[in-house]
Amino acid sequence: MAKWVYMFTEGNADMRNLLGGKGANLAEMTNLGLPVPQGFTVTTEACTQYYEDGRQINDEIMGQIMEAIDKMEGITGKKFGDAKNPLLVSVRSGARASMPGMMDTILNLGLNEEVVETLSQASGNPRWAWDCYRRFIQMFSDVVMEVGKKYFEELIDKMKEEKGVKQDVDLDADDLKKLAEQFKAEYKAKIGEDFPTDPKVQLMEAVKAVFRSWDNPRANVYRRDNDIPYSWGTAVNVQMMAFGNMGDDCGTGVAFTRDPATGENGLFGEFLTNAQGEDVVAGVRTPMHISEMEEKFPEAFKQFKEVCKTLETHYRDMQDMEFTVEHGKLYMLQTRNGKRTAKAALKIACDLVDEGMRTEEEAVAMIDPRNLDSLLHPQFDAKALKEATPMAKALGASPGAACGKIVFTADDAVEWAERGEKVVLVRLETSPEDITGMKSAQGILTVRGGMTSHAAVVARGMGTCCVSGCGDIVMDEANKKFTLAGKEYHEGDCISLDGSTGCIYDGLIPTVDATIAGEFGRIMGWADKYRTMKVRTNADTPADAKKARELGAEGIGLCRTEHMFFEGNRIDAFREMICAETVEEREAALAKILPEQQGDFE
């Protein structure tokens, strides 16, 4: 019989293909003796089987899930569905590749009216009990039954307005009990049946919902953008709840062992008291910096710092962690190698070598070459970018950052640039005739076209920032204006483009030039030291060739001569040659082209 379910004590970090990244790391943390609430993982193979069985969980998988629940009951001393001493669980997704925020989570599963009443009395904390229940109804309705969050948020906002408070935490137990009743009524109105009270039914529906979320639109987009195969499937992690919302001696947080933006070595993260995990991410309340946790929970913070050190030393990489503090006791809910900027990736890789955790070869292998490309182009000033909000997003067709005054024709781009203006060329689409304007512009924005359009290909070749295919733009070329995000832009107005992300910003955001120095220089030096291939460049002009040599190229590998004929009168001679109807006409055109080409190579 196939094994579809693994307890955390049965897995390890090497089983991520089967257990997913989250499940494998929960098992690894358990093996390391760290404080992890116990649970089990339903494998990625079970997800694949679910789809093969027509989006149904078969009896064999269902049986193994319930066997694992029995084992959890034995470990915890609690009973699933029992009113007196209930086992409450979270149900989370966990693909083998990290997909933050792409799939779904359900907390506090196992609650019903009877259990909540008992918990309310037994804990002496009715507010906590009803808060858990209203959260569970909202999550289950949204994730499992696809009743939108907005309906429940509207009820919460109405309740806060009636009570004259601004924060969810200011609602008392009676308020939350009323909300739970309103939520159940909303559920019945939308679904046509009562909210399920049987924890086993709740669990199976939640597992199916997580499997389903592997195929949701945002997960599909993320997989496509990050080359993650659909066939991998997701695992499901069922874990005993640790409660961060039981009072002021409880809390929840997300932290990195190093700063994911800069790579600086030091704890970076956020923390909320009397809250559950999604509150930090959702921005329901403004979280505190992780350092403030030391004042609130000194013992838990001391233990957390030790856990961070253990995990980073064990994984030999910067870690991204989720945790909960329940009555001063620390529980680890997740760890994974943290996402980071290209700049941070370089610093972290170099620091890990200096700290003796990685070899030079390993440090080079840690760097995603696709991210390095963004460092070779001008970048927005980090502080200024943090304060800016994009007004639209299209295709990041050519990396880098650009800001300047809007122009609508290639000729205007040349003219404005010659008098010292920095310009962004905005076109419906570009053509070869626009090449001079494209060269004069700081950046290019097109309404039509994709990653392989003329604008994208030429811009990448020139190292010019380009955002293409912004279909939200309503263009009026005749009057030199366009409308975007409800605002009308005219020639001379300022915009900023991020060719790495495709984001478009109103106004000017300061940029800084890229340099190969510091950590970038060290990594590239190590790459040169250990590589077995020579690196040459594609270059069509002396300026391109010079820049390539500055960036480490050893010579010219490809020179596409046709690109030399995009400028001035050259393109006319080239067209004469192509359109020539007689040998004499062709030879006459070639006679014009030959000295130009000879001059380029000389």
Model feature map: region roles:
Residues 393, 397-492, 501, 564:
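Conserved structured catalytic cores and adjacent interaction surfaces
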Residues 283-285, 347-352, 447-448, 513-528:
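A signal for specific C-terminal beta-sheet/loop modules enriched in small/flexible residues
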Residues 333-335, 490-538, 544:
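C-terminal domain-closing interface element
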Residues 1-388, 421-424, 431-436, 442, ...:
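Nucleotide/phosphate-binding sheet-loop regions of phosphoryl- and nucleotidyl-transfer enzymes
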